[in-house]
Amino acid sequence: MQLNKFFLGRWLTWPLAFSVGIHGSVIAALLYVSVEQMRIQPEIEDAPIAVTMVNIDTFAAPQPAAAEPQAEPEPEPEPEPEPIDEAPPEPEVLPEPVPVPIPEPVKPKPKPVKKEVKKPEVKKPDVKKTVAPPDDKPFKSDEPALVSTNAPVKSAPKASVPGVSTSTGPKALSKAKPTYPARALALGVEGQVKVQYDIDENGRVTNVRILEATPRNTFEREVKQVMRKWRFEAVAAKDYVTTVVFKIGGTTEMD
């Protein structure tokens, strides 16, 4: 115990003495420097004092710039949920079809046969013609005798209807036949088209009218197309009639 106290007291005295020595040397150095400065300081001569006006605003601290609005952070996209593998639906069990009894056809009842009743023929009584006896005196009449109606009577000639047929009037210079429609040819359909038209001063066909078409909406278009190419003599005529016949096999005929 005594040794411990000895070493402890010795350990505390050395740092204390070292600290006191350092502080004393610092104080002595400061006193020496201050005394030397007081000795060396020269005398200050009186000099005129220059006064300048200074704008305090120039030395004012600059106002802080307006803080820029901070961009809001974009929301992160939510992660898509992983698809859950759904179990395949169980196949529906179809019920077995129940056999339906087929009803027997009902036989129609036989219609009663009507018996024809023959009416008895009624015989007309014979009427005997009575002939008047001839007179001895001849009968005279002032009226002229009637002409027998059995004699042939000459009728006046009928006026010819212009343009009823192409046999009279302007002759055809170019009259091509229409083509057989492919659809009608494939189906094996035949028919005819009856058209009425006029001819102008240049021999061209105008004012085409469909009078009859069998079957309808099958051959009319081909007939109208080919009639645009027909040429006649340069004589005007009206109400010409032509019949175009389409036969199976792709042939056409015109009257």
UniProtKB/Swiss-Prot annotation:
3 X 2 AA tandem repeats of K-P: region residues: 107-112
The TonB C-terminal domain, residue ranges: 165-255
Keywords attached to this entry: Cell inner membrane, Cell membrane, Membrane, Protein transport, Repeat, Signal-anchor, Transmembrane, Transmembrane helix, Transport
Native source species: Yersinia enterocolitica
Periplasmic side: 34-255
A GO molecular function held by the record: energy transducer activity
Cellular compartments annotated: Cell inner membrane
A Pfam family it matches: TonB_N
Matches recorded under PANTHER family: PROTEIN TONB, PROTEIN TONB-RELATED
Segments for region (Disordered): 63-175
Signal sequence region: none
A Gene Ontology BP annotation from the UniProt entry: siderophore transport
Family stated for the protein in its record: Belongs to the TonB family.
Spans traversing the lipid bilayer: 11-33
Oligomeric and partner information: Homodimer. Forms a complex with the accessory proteins ExbB and ExbD.
UniProt feature, compositional bias: Basic and acidic residues: 113-143
Region feature 6 X 2 AA tandem repeats of E-P, mapped onto this chain: 72-83
Major location category of this protein: membrane
Biased composition (Acidic residues): 71-89
UniProt function note: Interacts with outer membrane receptor proteins that carry out high-affinity binding and energy dependent uptake into the periplasmic space of specific substrates. It could act to transduce energy from the cytoplasmic membrane to specific energy-requiring processes in the outer membrane, resulting in the release into the periplasm of ligands bound by these outer membrane proteins.
Topological domains annotated Cytoplasmic: 1-10
GO cellular component, one term: outer membrane-bounded periplasmic space
Keyword Cell membrane part of the UniProt annotation: yes
Name used for this protein in its record: Protein TonB
Gene3D superfamilies: TonB
Bias (Pro residues) ranges: 90-105
Sequence repeat positions: 72-73, 74-75, 76-77, 78-79, 80-81, 82-83, 94-95, 96-97, 98-99, 100-101, 102-103, 104-105, 107-108, 109-110, 111-112
